[in-house]
Amino acid sequence: MRILVTGGLGAVGAPLTRELRRRGHEVWVADRVHAEGPNYLRCDVGMYRQVERLFEDRTFDLVYHLAAEFGRWNGEDFYETLWQSNAIGTKNILRMQEKYGFRMVFTSSSEVYGDYEGEMVEDVMDRVPIRQLNDYAITKWVNEMQIMNSAERFGTETVRVRLFNTYGPGEYYSEYRSVICRFIYHALHDLPYTVYLDHHRSSTY
């Protein structure tokens, strides 16, 4: 299968790309950083013409759309980049999907559920309305709405995956990264942890 991974050099995209290649797929990577490698395509998904060029001379059976700005605080501080990359970027990919008919896997986020204060059990997501509390979450929810709209209007096929607290090799530390990345960094550097509300809480890390 010929597969395109947008954001394929990121903390999630890079290991996904390696695994897909290990399974024998022909994998192309699109990312906005300067890099070299097999089947690498430099592209900022927020720029329509750059996205259009990805599909001019090649076809794909499946696209994993991971390219996005990450994190709630990053989104609050750099909201213009967030909306351009996340919302406009996904719309650009959807335009290509409507034209070329490839299937897609879109990585959304658990952030779309908001800050639920009760005990999180399996059916909460079915019973409690989604309530966005930050720009990052809103862009992910907007993307899901765009995807469902495209499916209704054009018959596109996309699986939406809401990832929870991803972490792993290759994730660099910054104040905008995930809580797991920050906790590990603080542990390695003997720094205190900041826990909000109280310490009588648990999460599926």
Q: Model segments located where?
A:
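N-terminal Rossmann NAD(P)H-binding glycine-rich loop of SDR-like oxidoreductase domains
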Residues: I3-R23
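Active-site helix of classical SDR
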Residues: D135, T139-V142
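Catalytic Tyr-X3-Lys loop
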Residues: E76-K91, R95, I138
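NAD(P)-dependent short-chain dehydrogenase/reductase
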Residues: G118, M145-T204
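Conserved Rossmann-fold NAD(P)-dependent oxidoreductase catalytic core, especially the SDR/UDP-sugar
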Residues: T59, K91-L133
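Active-site segment of SDR-like NAD(P)-dependent oxidoreductases
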Residues: E69-W73, S110-E117, F164-Y167
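Rossmann-fold cofactor-recognition segment
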Residues: E36-M47
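NAD(P)H-binding glycine-rich loop region in Rossmannoid oxidoreductase-like domains
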Residues: V45-S85
